Amino acid sequence: MARSFPPPSALRDFLESESAGGILLIFAAILAMIVANSPLATLYHDLIHAVTGPVLTDKLGPMTVHLWINDGLMAVFFLLVGLEIKREFVDGRLASWDRRRLPFIAAAAGMAVPAALYMFFVGDEPGLAQGWAIPAATDIAFAMGVLALLGRRAPTSLKLFLVTVAIVDDMGAVAIIALFYTAKINLLALGAAAAILGIMFACNRGGVKNLLVYMALFLLLWYAMLLSGVHATIAGVLAAMAIPFERTPGAPDSQTSPLHRLEHALHPTVAFAIVPLFGFANAGVDVRALGLDQLFAPLPLGIAAGLFLGKQIGIFGSVWLAVKLGIAGRLRGATWLQVYAVSMLCGIGFTMSLFIGSLAFPGNALLIEEAKIGILMGSLASALVGFAVLRLAPLHPEHNAVESASKGEIAVDGDVRDTSEAAR
């Protein structure tokens, strides 16, 4: 008999775990900064770079705690990202082109404008161009954590908008990692990965619903991708596409669907362990000897400007233009000022930005540290200003009525109806 799980809605579970996990991530990042700037700094760096073994590839050498987190545990994070993408596209908020239109427009502009701003600030500085994708990412957990601090003042339509934009943003980030941050390809290992993925899809087509089978194949796929030169975390997204899924339009999520079961099982681990661990292992930057010349160097300044200015300009500007041109409707129960504030919260890059930063400048500790400074500055500014604006923004006149309707939909069915005024 399939194991039952509460709650019935994957979307409600997602919103709750991302919010709570985001708050934990905030504390993990703050703790990392405190420790990295204290007498415990040496112990902190020795711990995260401690060799644990074994040697999985000649390129990586002996595995360290940091490598296990960034190349191992983050593959599980990307597996969950892939599951969320598949669920939303097949049976959720992105199941139709009408629903995809606004998040796609917002996410595309929200990646393009920050990247363009970054390139403007770094100019022709040698070796910095490959960091263009760092400010293009959004940390959904961190942003949802900030929204959670606002309680009922954050309209559900804004939370759902943030979720869908971030999911499309994640798709873009995955594509960027696969296309632009891939080392020399080992064709034999890549062929093995393709064969393993083919077996996973064959199991899906054959009606295999045992998650242990898929998880065993996922481990093999991860190792093959690690050997191939394509970043191993991509294995998570690819594996997610092969997990069987049962559509439940207009009804609660199926308790026998392998994808739903795996998503529910992974959410707590990813939100409360993997993402905070990643934040703690990657956010520790020693700023004790930091001068203004380092803060305003092209790399950190370009990243900070891309996250704080680029995201809000790209997302809010594209949403406003789409509504004015009749391409999409306004978000139900949300004012323009609230939409602007959430556009700022999308500038919290953190997890994905730190991850891309480590790929953009491999082996260059100085540039990676400068990238971290820019990510922390841009993310912190986006979080603080976005929170303040959303906290002070007047509520929409129909706030209470729209909230009651939205919560009823989420409680009964994860397939929430369109949250734009055009759908009314």
From Swiss-Prot:
<feature type="transmembrane region" description="Helical">
    <location>
        <begin position="373"/>
        <end position="393"/>
    </location>
</feature>
<keyword id="KW-0406">Ion transport</keyword>
<dbReference type="Pfam" id="PF06965">
    <property type="entry name" value="Na_H_antiport_1"/>
</dbReference>
<feature type="transmembrane region" description="Helical">
    <location>
        <begin position="23"/>
        <end position="43"/>
    </location>
</feature>
<protein>
    <recommendedName>
        <fullName>Na(+)/H(+) antiporter NhaA</fullName>
    </recommendedName>
</protein>
<dbReference type="GO" id="GO:0005886">
    <property type="term" value="C:plasma membrane"/>
</dbReference>
<keyword id="KW-0812">Transmembrane</keyword>
<dbReference type="GO" id="GO:0006885">
    <property type="term" value="P:regulation of pH"/>
</dbReference>
<keyword id="KW-0915">Sodium</keyword>
<keyword id="KW-0813">Transport</keyword>
<feature type="transmembrane region" description="Helical">
    <location>
        <begin position="160"/>
        <end position="180"/>
    </location>
</feature>
<keyword id="KW-0997">Cell inner membrane</keyword>
<feature type="transmembrane region" description="Helical">
    <location>
        <begin position="265"/>
        <end position="285"/>
    </location>
</feature>
<keyword id="KW-0739">Sodium transport</keyword>
<dbReference type="InterPro" id="IPR023171">
    <property type="entry name" value="Na/H_antiporter_dom_sf"/>
</dbReference>
<feature type="transmembrane region" description="Helical">
    <location>
        <begin position="183"/>
        <end position="203"/>
    </location>
</feature>
<keyword id="KW-0050">Antiport</keyword>
<comment type="function">
    <text>Na(+)/H(+) antiporter that extrudes sodium in exchange for external protons.</text>
</comment>
<feature type="transmembrane region" description="Helical">
    <location>
        <begin position="131"/>
        <end position="151"/>
    </location>
</feature>
<feature type="transmembrane region" description="Helical">
    <location>
        <begin position="65"/>
        <end position="85"/>
    </location>
</feature>
<dbReference type="GO" id="GO:0015385">
    <property type="term" value="F:sodium:proton antiporter activity"/>
</dbReference>
<feature type="transmembrane region" description="Helical">
    <location>
        <begin position="341"/>
        <end position="361"/>
    </location>
</feature>
<keyword id="KW-1133">Transmembrane helix</keyword>
<feature type="transmembrane region" description="Helical">
    <location>
        <begin position="303"/>
        <end position="323"/>
    </location>
</feature>
<keyword id="KW-1003">Cell membrane</keyword>
<feature type="transmembrane region" description="Helical">
    <location>
        <begin position="102"/>
        <end position="122"/>
    </location>
</feature>
<feature type="transmembrane region" description="Helical">
    <location>
        <begin position="211"/>
        <end position="231"/>
    </location>
</feature>
<dbReference type="InterPro" id="IPR004670">
    <property type="entry name" value="NhaA"/>
</dbReference>
<comment type="similarity">
    <text>Belongs to the NhaA Na(+)/H(+) (TC 2.A.33) antiporter family.</text>
</comment>
<keyword id="KW-0472">Membrane</keyword>
